[in-house]
């Protein structure tokens, strides 16, 4: 077992890590017009992940931009409700609700989408955000939990979760050259949250354990 001191070092220095080889960067010149979000469709989770606000932002954008939103995630007790909400707004041509997808499919979506949307009300670490960034995707999210520590200045932090705010930032950045943000996003995850960084942290813990014995 780790000593108390070593355990403290491990918790402090070794956050979640990403396989940055598997989650490699997809260049923006190869990306299309898709938006992507991952959200398990449980009733509380769709509120936490602001899924209805994301859907409403698509309604605001559909006549301005040629874009399509893909929603992935385990089917929960709000799945049918979300499908109905999309249908009643006449957005079936603009939004696909995919349900559960494989990791291979997730990687394809992350490497081909224009923006990854996760404007949450609260988060822990924000693992999906880190995975998206590692794939070089420009993330639109909020300053909650540890998200700002993950994103830094290599993504788009919005001030609130209103549909108008989400829609405005997508429209503002849509025609920008996003390659520099993409490069910065992957680089940040590779530097701070890669498996190589985790291995280094573990070695530091081992050294700490050695020093305490």
Task: Name every feature range the model reports, one short phrase each.
Residues 138-141:
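Short hydrophobic beta-strand element within catalytic cores of glycosyltransferases
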Residues 27-49, 55-58, 70:
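Conserved donor-binding/catalytic core segment of Leloir-type glycosyltransferases
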